[in-house]
Amino acid sequence: MSAALPITAVPACASGWQAMLDLRFGHRAGQGSVLSHARHSGPLRVQKPLHPEGPGICHAVLLHPPGGVAGGDQLQIDVTVEPGAHALLTTPGATRWYKSQGRPAAQRVRLRVEEGAILEWLPQENMLFAGADATMALDLDLAPGARAIGWDAVVLGRYGAGEHWNHTGAAPTAAARLQLHNRLACGGRPLWLEQGELHAGHALLSSPVAWAGLPIQASLWAVAPEPLAAMEPLSEQLAASLPWSDEVRAGASLLAGQGGAPSVLLLRVLARRMEAARAVLHEGWRLLRPALLNQQARPPRLWAT
């Protein structure tokens, strides 16, 4: 992808929902991992936290009651996981990004994982309707000794209904634009940076070295303080299990940490249908969760609904 805005520069939006959600998870003696702080403004909420795996892991579901992101909306989500706590966050369904009508929409997510804490950031996919102008930014910063697994997925258009994100009928939709900013860091030191921009007619949409004409892109990342010698066989095991066909293509890579920094394991997916991309993400999580988080891979019940 081509270079775009710096990670800190999520553009201000014109009139629309201005929403904020600030969550903090802590570890309490005799209680385990708990949601210790929740503050919001605008239409962002968190459901009552649950502990389906026992007190050690706090599950939380993030809600956006309007049901979609419209032109001019600006959403900000801040999550902090304190030492010793383990939080798993997901969403109840796809986030729909509607036609922007000349007003860009944006969502910025800032995740902070403190020493000895664990975060699983597992939202469902982002679906861009025809003419959506969307900016999505994710900034994860881990303290030494922290662990995190997360993913994101982008669907360009409602392909099941024959709708394309960058076309209305046979004509390109000039307003269609997607800006992505991802930053993973440890102690403020970058581990992985990705910035890019797509728009209607962009060559990357059809390029065999980019989107290859497929409407879905997904990424899974895992950061853990394991030595490189322990991460390499895990990366190879993951890569060997991944599909490569006309319907879904996936690959894995390992970014070695430098100077004592943790390594980052990346899984990238292109797919024609979200079901195929989702299956690859779930299988990656099932492999990595026991190995890196020392927890059985028990999918949240919400994923089955």
Curated annotation (Swiss-Prot):
Its main location: cytoplasm. Pfam families: UreD. InterPro entries: UreD. It is found in: Cytoplasm. Keywords: Chaperone, Cytoplasm, Nickel. GO terms for cellular component: cytoplasm. One of its GO terms (molecular function) is nickel cation binding. It comes from the Bacteria. UreD, UreF and UreG form a complex that acts as a GTP-hydrolysis-dependent molecular chaperone, activating the urease apoprotein by helping to assemble the nickel containing metallocenter of UreC. The UreE protein probably delivers the nickel. Belongs to the UreD family. Required for maturation of urease via the functional incorporation of the urease nickel metallocenter. This is Urease accessory protein UreD. The lineage of its organism: Bacteria, Pseudomonadati, Pseudomonadota, Betaproteobacteria, Burkholderiales. The gene is ureD.
